[in-house]
C-alpha cells in the first residue's frame, strides 16, 4: 500500500467488494500504529441490497478487529442516477459522496481501485458492449492516478487517494489470506 498521509478525518469508499474491504483492513492496521486519532468514516453507494449488506459486514468486521481506532459512521446512499443529467455513475457518486463529506468536514477519500489484469481476449469480448469501461480498464492496467481532486457541483472540494493502485486482485486476496481475514473473502461480493 502507498504510504498514507495523516488526515484529521478520512472517508473510505466501501463497495462491498474485496478490494475496498482489503483497503479498510490495511488502513485500520496502519492507523493502529500511526494515526489513532484520525476519524474514520465509510460510505457505500448501492443499487442492490447485497452490496450494502456486504459493505456493512466489512465495516463491522474491521471495526471489531481494530476497535481502538476512532471509528465514526458508515454512510450509505442509493446510487441510482439520471443518465441524462450525469454522464456516468462516477460523476453521480462524486455528487452524492460530497454531501456527506461536507456535513462532516471531510476532505479526503480512500478508494480501493486496483490494477486490471484481464487478458486481451477478455477485453475484446467486452469491447462492443462496454467500450467506455474497456478503455478505462486498458488505462488502469498501466497507470492509475493515485491522487485526484474533485470539485462537485455543490463546490465541496475533496481529494480521492488510491493507496492500493499498485495491487492486482490476486495481490489483494493474498494480503487478506496472509492476515487471516478470510471472512472478508467469503462475505464480499467480488
Each PLM stretch: what is its role?
Residues 1-190:
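Nucleotide-activated chemistry modules centered on ATP-dependent adenylation/adenylyltransferase
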Amino acid at each position: 500500500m502507498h504510504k498514507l498521509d495523516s488526515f484529521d478525518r478520512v472517508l473510505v469508499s466501501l463497495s462491498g467488494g474485496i478490494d475496498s474491504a482489503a483497503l479498510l483492513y490495511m488502513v485500520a492496521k496502519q492507523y493502529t500504529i500511526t494515526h489513532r486519532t484520525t476519524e474514520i468514516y465509510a460510505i457505500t453507494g448501492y443499487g442492490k441490497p447485497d452490496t450494502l449488506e456486504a459493505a456493512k459486514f466489512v465495516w463491522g468486521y474491521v471495526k471489531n478487529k481494530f476497535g481502538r481506532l476512532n471509528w465514526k459512521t458508515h454512510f450509505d446512499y442509493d446510487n441510482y442516477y439520471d443518465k441524462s443529467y450525469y454522464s456516468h455513475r462516477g460523476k453521480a457518486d462524486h455528487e452524492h459522496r460530497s454531501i456527506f463529506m461536507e456535513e462532516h468536514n471531510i476532505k479526503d477519500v480512500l478508494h480501493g481501485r486496483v490494477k486490471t489484469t484481464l487478458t486481451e481476449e477478455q477485453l475484446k469480448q467486452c469491447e462492443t458492449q462496454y467500450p467506455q469501461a474497456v478503455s478505462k480498464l486498458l488505462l488502469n492496467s498501466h497507470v492509475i492516478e493515485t491522487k485526484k481532486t474533485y470539485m462537485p457541483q455543490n463546490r465541496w472540494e475533496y481529494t480521492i487517494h488510491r493507496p492500493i493502485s499498485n495491487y492486482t486482485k490476486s495481490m489483494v486476496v493474498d494480503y487478506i489470506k496472509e492476515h487471516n481475514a478470510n471472512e472478508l473473502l467469503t462475505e464480499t461480493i467480488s
